[in-house]
């Protein structure tokens, strides 16, 4: 490309340097001439002495070759790689280990002690001999794997070399010398981890026991974390120690950052990919970090002219340069167009310079929108800008001239020329160079070649094929007389298209995305090979879920893949993964890290999605954070190709691990305590889905193990009928003969489930392998839908903790109780999902209509146990629940047992649950033992107090109930027993506490027997009373039913009672009643008169024989036979027994004795237990209506009436005001 130039006679001082006189100019010209003569000797291809090309070359070469042998490489690849590795680290020339050490020493200006140096070099020399010996033995064995002698030799040398390098590593991290030794340490650690990988690759063939192979593997995992954390820690320490205040210190700081990224952090980022169990086939990794070559500014000025070096030319401060050059974390992008703007610095026709003064760069993330950044001066039109095209081009090399001009005695630093060498990675024949070139006749030039700092991976091929890095961005250091571009580079492994091949695992870093919502790119922790993506919490707003979207390309349309995600979180998080438009995974994942701000190597976890798919599913992979209160970091997505054989082997290995994980490591016939019944069912599904074609024998063997595990699970489960074959209905507490059935119910409850009629048993579905139950909502909280069972005392061990657990498909307002000394309680809301099946799955139904549990589906983590244990309501994102309870001393006679209760008491509530277990967890010791003993004592003390109070309350209530009847046969009421007296007696009966459990008033408590005894007699009294009162609906509880109405009347609720209200004098209510002629009746009315006039209740026959009761607002004393009644005194005609307690008026009968009972609260008030035994208005509401006393002002009157015919009329009316009637009774007298 031809650059545009201006006329040399034009002087454009873009830097606004002040003009000077001709005399001064001439004088300074002579000075400049002398300076120019001195500087000319510095022209040429000079290299900064701080940059050691051989050091960087070795690091780049090793990392590049490792990228080609990740996972499980072919044997030929591995042999070639080890030969290369030995040749790189122990060549015939100068020792690279010494170069590593000296290079870091020079950068940080700290030397190790002579003893440290000599010891390290000597030990490394020994390791080199051992490694070369091992490499030769490995090649010999690979040529003939069946040769016993070769196998014996390689195993012997492997064990010796591994032990040698294990003991050598500490010599490379001497205290206070960790930073200068860091590059040596990283290379040695890399050798050790590669060697440990060989045990997994070849150990079995060499004759190692499987336990030895596993031990080496576990050491590899442990050392991976240890080595990674050490390298990152001391890299950060060394870098922070180099922070300074001026430009020269920034130059050294940047060189350390670049060179140790190449020689240390790039290796560390590849360590996890040596794991052959996670990466069992060839693996493609990518490094997305950015590094910065040195600024294009003169640094080699001769002695005496140091001011012409860019960093001495009034350069910006350290922090200003870092802010201008270092890019904040961002999605990976690629430059597409660079426009360079120029300015002129001219002293004379023989000394002038046009140079790079600003630029505009267009760049784009993969598949994303175009972005633009500008730096420096971009609005100057005096010199035409130069535009360079980079779209689809990798700029693999830059060559730039740093020029210097002198104005008077002031140096001007700038770049008059730069060449960008490129190649199209999709078309290797499209290669060339594009150039920025401006006129320059200055006093010195220095060439900066990026290959000096970032050499190709090998010199055996052309650099356009073997380049290691590509240009990614350009910054600009700006001073008064200074412009120094800084090139930013990414590793070549981070491709432009996120291409996924068919024969290898492909790692796609999340920062290679195109769209990020409610999240951010954050600096990587140092061991990830680049930055990572943080998805924020949504704070309960589902429209605000953090989301990252990454475009992908498949080279094969037929290959099936699985996706794996590497993530980190400090709490359990709910993650959703989509492919194209299909959601393929939604699950609650366990926490992996203690902090997201200081991540360590072991703080990342993997979640593998078993749903296999092809390229037809979509060309986008995305992750959403469904969590309301938790954040998650996404490092990368990994695409694992799935072949029929690979999938069968993978499924078999996964099933074998799952089955073996059911049992303890010390006893393969003993089930682990934390293995749930639901988990066993899911493992059985996993085994059932294994291929009969590839692993029939293994499948049968695994099935036997799973069946055995299921039997063990059933044996330890103390619940009866855990698979829900039958649910019994609620029994009556009274048998036919009226005696309490409490004992039989207590016993029957220990033999299966009891529940309300709306609780249903469902057959297994895509979530449950066996039966499960559903609890629907209810319209009345006093009549909940429930399910319960009692664990009998004979099943329990003294001083032992037990655990209730199970699996909830979904629920809202589900209350769970464990009850012994008191109640342990949780309310669980478990979100469900509309479908377990991704959109790509057409039919989750088997051939016979059964759930197809082998089809790809959304998976919930069966191992995650997340339960609220503070008694508070909580929204679970785990479908598992656990609730534990401690048992103290056991007493078979008392048979306290443990009640297991599930309850829904809201209209919106529901639950689907199954795989319920009640198992022994552990014996109680220490504090837990002391706590349960204290709780047990408190409970017994409370019960003793309760017994004393119950005896007094029961005696009073029994006397009152007995007084309602004529004798102890309880088949006839006393003649003067009225409805208010029955209600009063009933209220006394309900003062008996602990008749039922407050958590579920269908379960008998310790006073159920005596309560039911008296309650049955109250029911008898009501029945006898209803039979005796010949007026229908006399209490108006059914409105105006059975009454004839004239005019406007109403029935109103007042104080929870139904009252007839006659507001007008012309209104009337009447009822015809059948009676027995010649018998005597008592007409009893409770009413209240408002205003003037009278309220009248009249009884009469067709002709004559009329009588009436009149009510006034304030009556004078009226005399009734053997009784009196006064204004606002509603004493009824009770005969001579008016003062007897059973004959007291409503107010007296319902008067509450505040000293009659104690406040029954739970005694087990330990922190982990929840107090639910507080006042509960539904506690004894089993058909009982708690009638309050009639308010003051009501009067009860009665009269005797002897009908002469078989029909009488009851008429209710008034003369004025308002008449309110509570009840009307017509009672047959006893003969």
Curated annotation (Swiss-Prot):
<comment type="similarity">
    <text>Belongs to the delta endotoxin family.</text>
</comment>
<comment type="function">
    <text>Promotes colloidosmotic lysis by binding to the midgut epithelial cells of lepidopteran larvae. Toxic to Plutella xylostella.</text>
</comment>
<dbReference type="Pfam" id="PF21463">
    <property type="entry name" value="Cry1Ac_dom-VII"/>
</dbReference>
<dbReference type="GO" id="GO:0001907">
    <property type="term" value="P:symbiont-mediated killing of host cell"/>
</dbReference>
<dbReference type="InterPro" id="IPR005639">
    <property type="entry name" value="Pest_crys_dom_I"/>
</dbReference>
<dbReference type="InterPro" id="IPR005638">
    <property type="entry name" value="Pest_crys_dom-III"/>
</dbReference>
<protein>
    <recommendedName>
        <fullName>Pesticidal crystal protein Cry1Bd</fullName>
    </recommendedName>
</protein>
<dbReference type="GO" id="GO:0005102">
    <property type="term" value="F:signaling receptor binding"/>
</dbReference>
<dbReference type="InterPro" id="IPR048645">
    <property type="entry name" value="Cry1Ac-like_dom-VII"/>
</dbReference>
<dbReference type="InterPro" id="IPR038979">
    <property type="entry name" value="Pest_crys"/>
</dbReference>
<dbReference type="InterPro" id="IPR008979">
    <property type="entry name" value="Galactose-bd-like_sf"/>
</dbReference>
<dbReference type="InterPro" id="IPR041587">
    <property type="entry name" value="Cry_V"/>
</dbReference>
<dbReference type="Pfam" id="PF03945">
    <property type="entry name" value="Endotoxin_N"/>
</dbReference>
<keyword id="KW-0749">Sporulation</keyword>
<dbReference type="InterPro" id="IPR036399">
    <property type="entry name" value="Pest_cryst_cen_dom_sf"/>
</dbReference>
<dbReference type="Pfam" id="PF17997">
    <property type="entry name" value="Cry1Ac_D5"/>
</dbReference>
<dbReference type="InterPro" id="IPR001178">
    <property type="entry name" value="Pest_cryst_dom_II"/>
</dbReference>
<keyword id="KW-0843">Virulence</keyword>
<dbReference type="GO" id="GO:0090729">
    <property type="term" value="F:toxin activity"/>
</dbReference>
<keyword id="KW-0800">Toxin</keyword>
<dbReference type="InterPro" id="IPR036716">
    <property type="entry name" value="Pest_crys_N_sf"/>
</dbReference>
<dbReference type="Pfam" id="PF00555">
    <property type="entry name" value="Endotoxin_M"/>
</dbReference>
<dbReference type="GO" id="GO:0030435">
    <property type="term" value="P:sporulation resulting in formation of a cellular spore"/>
</dbReference>
<dbReference type="Pfam" id="PF03944">
    <property type="entry name" value="Endotoxin_C"/>
</dbReference>
């Amino acid at each position: 490309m031809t650059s545009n130039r201006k006329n040399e006679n034009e002087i454009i001082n873009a830097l606004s340097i002040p003009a000077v006189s001709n005399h001064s100019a001439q004088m300074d010209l002579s000075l400049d001439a002398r300076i120019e003569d001195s500087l000319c000797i510095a022209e040429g291809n000079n290299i900064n002495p701080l940059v050691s090309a051989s050091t960087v070359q070795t690091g780049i070469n090793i990392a590049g070759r490792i990228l080609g042998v990740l996972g499980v490489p072919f044997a030929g690849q591995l042999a070639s790689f080890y030969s290369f590795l030995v040749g790189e680290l122990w060549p015939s020339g100068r020792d690279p280990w010494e170069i590593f050490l000296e290079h870091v020493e020079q950068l940080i200006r700290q030397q190790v002690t002579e003893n440290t140096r000599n010891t390290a070099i000597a030990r490394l020399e020994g390791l080199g001999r051992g490694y070369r010996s091992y490499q030769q033995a490995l090649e010999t064995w690979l040529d003939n794997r069946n040769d016993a002698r070769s196998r014996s030799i390689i195993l012997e040398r492997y064990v010796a070399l591994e032990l040698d390098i294990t003991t050598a590593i500490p010599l490379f991290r001497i205290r206070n010398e960790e930073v200068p030794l860091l590059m040596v340490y990283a290379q040695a650690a890399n050798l050790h981890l590669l060697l440990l990988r060989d045990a997994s690759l070849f150990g079995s063939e060499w004759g190692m026991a499987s336990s030895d192979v596993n031990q080496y593997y576990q050491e590899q995992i442990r050392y991976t974390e240890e080595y990674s954390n050490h390298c990152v820690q001391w890299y950060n320490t060394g870098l922070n120690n180099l922070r300074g205040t001026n430009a020269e210190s920034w130059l050294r700081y940047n060189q350390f950052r670049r060179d140790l990224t190449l020689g240390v952090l790039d290796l560390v980022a590849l360590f996890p990919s040596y794991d052959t169990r996670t990466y069992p086939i060839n693996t493609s990794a990518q490094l997305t970090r950015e590094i910065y070559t040195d600024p294009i500014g003169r640094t080699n000025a001769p002695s005496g002219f140091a001011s012409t070096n860019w960093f001495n030319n009034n350069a910006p401060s350290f922090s200003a340069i870092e802010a201008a050059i270092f890019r904040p974390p961002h999605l990976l992008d690629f430059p597409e167009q660079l426009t360079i703007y120029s300015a002129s610095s001219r002293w004379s026709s023989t000394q002038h310079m046009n140079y790079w003064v600003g630029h505009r760069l267009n760049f784009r993330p993969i598949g994303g929108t175009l972005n633009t950044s500008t730096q420096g001066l971009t609005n100057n039109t005096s010199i035409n800008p130069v535009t360079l095209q980079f779209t689809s081009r990798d700029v693999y090399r830059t060559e730039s001239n740093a020029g210097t001009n002198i104005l008077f005695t002031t140096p001007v630093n700038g770049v008059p020329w730069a060449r960008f060498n490129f190649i199209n990675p999709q078309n290797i024949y499209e290669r060339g160079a594009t150039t920025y070139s401006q006129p320059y006749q200055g006093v010195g030039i220095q060439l900066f070649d990026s290959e000096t700092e970032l050499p190709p991976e090998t010199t055996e091929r052309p650099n356009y094929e073997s380049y290691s890095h590509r240009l990614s961005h350009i910054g600009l250091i700006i001073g008064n007389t200074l412009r120094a571009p800084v090139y930013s580079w990414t590793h070549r492994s981070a491709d432009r298209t996120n291409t996924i091949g068919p024969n290898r695992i492909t790692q796609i870093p999340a920062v290679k995305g195109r769209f990020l919502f409610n999240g951010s790119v954050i600096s990587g922790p140092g061991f990830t090979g680049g930055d990572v993506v943080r998805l924020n919490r949504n704070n309960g707003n589902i429209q605000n879920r953090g989301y990252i979207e990454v475009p992908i390309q498949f080279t094969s349309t037929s290959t099936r893949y699985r996706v794996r995600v590497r993530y980190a979180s400090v709490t359990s998080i709910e993650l959703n993964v989509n492919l194209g438009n299909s959601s393929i995974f939604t699950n609650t994942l366990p926490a992996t890290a203690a902090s997201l701000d200081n991540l360590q190597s072991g703080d990342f976890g993997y979640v593998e999605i078993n749903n296999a798919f092809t390229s037809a599913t979509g060309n986008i992979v995305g992750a959403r954070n469904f969590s309301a209160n938790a954040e998650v970091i996404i490092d990368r997505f990994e695409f694992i190709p799935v072949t029929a054989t690979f999938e069968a082997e993978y499924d078999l290995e996964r099933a074998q691990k799952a089955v073996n994980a059911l049992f303890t490591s010390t006893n393969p016939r003993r089930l682990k305590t934390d293995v749930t019944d639901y988990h066993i069912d899911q493992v059985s599904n996993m085994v059932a889905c294994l291929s009969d074609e590839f692993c029939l024998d293994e499948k049968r063997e695994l099935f036997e193990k799973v069946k055995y595990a299921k039997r063990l699970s059933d044996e330890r489960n103390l619940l009866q009928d855990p698979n829900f074959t039958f649910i019994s209905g609620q029994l009556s507490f009274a048998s036919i003969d009226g005696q309490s059935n409490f004992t039989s119910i207590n016993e029957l409850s220990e033999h299966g489930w009891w529940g309300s009629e709306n609780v249903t048993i469902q057959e297994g579905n895509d979530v449950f392998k066996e039966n499960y139950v559903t609890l629907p909502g209810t319209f009345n909280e006093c009549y909940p839908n429930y399910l319960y069972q009692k664990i009998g005392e004979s099943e329990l061990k003294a001083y032992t903790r037990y655990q209730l657990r199970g699996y909830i498909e979904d629920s809202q307002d589900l209350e769970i109780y464990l009850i012994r000394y008191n109640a342990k309680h949780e309310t669980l809301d478990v979100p469900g999902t509309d479908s377990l099946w991704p959109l790509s799955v057409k039919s989750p139904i088997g051939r016979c209509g059964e759930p197809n549990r082998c089809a790809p589906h959304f998976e919930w983590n069966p191992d995650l146990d997340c339960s609220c244990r503070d008694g508070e309501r909580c929204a679970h994102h785990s479908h598992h629940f656990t609730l534990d309870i401690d048992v103290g001393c056991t007493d078979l006679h008392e048979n306290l047992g443990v009640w297991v209760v599930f309850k829904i008491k809201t209209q919106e509530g529901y639950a689907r649950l199954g795989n319920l277990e009640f198992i022994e967890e552990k014996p109680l010791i220490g504090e837990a033992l002391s706590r349960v003993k204290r709780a047990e004592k408190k409970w017994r003390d409370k019960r003793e107090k309760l017994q004393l109070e119950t005896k007094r309350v029961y005696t009073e209530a029994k006397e009152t109930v007995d007084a309602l009847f004529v004798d102890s046969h309880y088949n006839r009421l006393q003649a003067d027993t009225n409805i208010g007296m029955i209600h009063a007696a009933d209220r006394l009966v309900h003062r008996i506490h602990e008749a039922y459990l407050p958590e579920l008033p269908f379960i008998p408590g310790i006073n159920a027997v005596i309560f039911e005894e008296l309650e049955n007699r109250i029911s008898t009294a009501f029945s006898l009373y209803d039979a005796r009162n010949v007026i229908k609906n006399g209490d108006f509880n059914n409105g105006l039913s059975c009454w004839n109405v004239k005019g406007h009347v109403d029935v109103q609720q007042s104080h929870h009672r139904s009252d007839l209200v006659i507001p007008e004098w012309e209104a009337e209510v009447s009822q015809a009643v059948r009676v027995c002629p010649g018998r005597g009746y008592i007409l009893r009315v409770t009413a209240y008169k408002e205003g003037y006039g009278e309220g009248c209740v009249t009884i009469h026959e067709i002709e004559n024989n009329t009588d009436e009761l009149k009510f006034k607002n304030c009556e004078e004393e009226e005399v009734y036979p053997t009784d009196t009644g006064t204004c606002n005194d509603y004493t009824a005609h009770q005969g001579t027994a008016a003062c007897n307690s059973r004959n007291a008026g409503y107010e007296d009968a319902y008067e509450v004795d505040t000293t009659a009972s104690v406040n029954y609260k739970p005694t087990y008030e330990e922190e982990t237990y929840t107090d639910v035994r507080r006042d509960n208005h539904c506690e004894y509401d089993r058909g009982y209506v708690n009638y309050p006393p009639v308010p003051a002002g009501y009067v009860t009157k009665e009269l005797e009436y002897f009908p002469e015919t078989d029909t009488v009329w009851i008429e209710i009316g008034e003369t004025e005001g308002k008449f309110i009637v509570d009840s009307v009774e017509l009672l047959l007298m006893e003969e």
